[in-house]
Amino acid sequence: MIDDNWELLNGPAAHHIEQLNSISAINVLEALVTFLIASRPAGSPYPMMPNAGGLCELHRSSTLFLLHRPGEYRDIEVNVQDLVTGEVVFQPPPCSEVPHWMEDFFNELGKLWTSGDALDVASFVLWRVNWIHPFKNGNGRTARAFAYACLCARLGVILPGRTTVIDQIMRSRPAYEAAIRAADQAAVQGQRNLAPMKQYLNGLLQIQMASI
């Protein structure tokens, strides 16, 4: 996704860097998944769970030469705006709370890693990283990459297919955003509703498998 809200530069040069960075991020993603699968804990049926270092490295590789501090959590307030109207549609937690929320995120991911299935894990990651918005910019692409890495790792394979789940998300944004809104609205009530996100991702996964 092309962005025009970078710190270091914008315009055609920034767009070209985004494209180059996307290739680097794919390599980092595949390296991360390969490492997690190969580092399966002894006696465990599950691969190693990714940590904050993996998440931050995916962000760094996606935003290098575009942000002053790629791969580092934000220290300013941000919001999510409607691309057409400019209306604020979501207010992430204050930057002072990001470390707390990220610690909570990885604790919950650790429990879900063994109690849920691969789609449960990916659904939670995709929603929660977007909800926390831990970085100044590039949160969406990092959430998608990390969720896909978790999906592949939890399944124990770098998924084949010409049309990946990540590619499809960018082509079906209304359904993607609707699933995020459903989870956001439930969170306001102190509840969890990741069923729409899981159903959405399952559909994309089936399309990817059919493209082999």
Regions inferred by a protein language model and the residue ranges of each:
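FIC/Doc superfamily catalytic core
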Residues: M1-I212
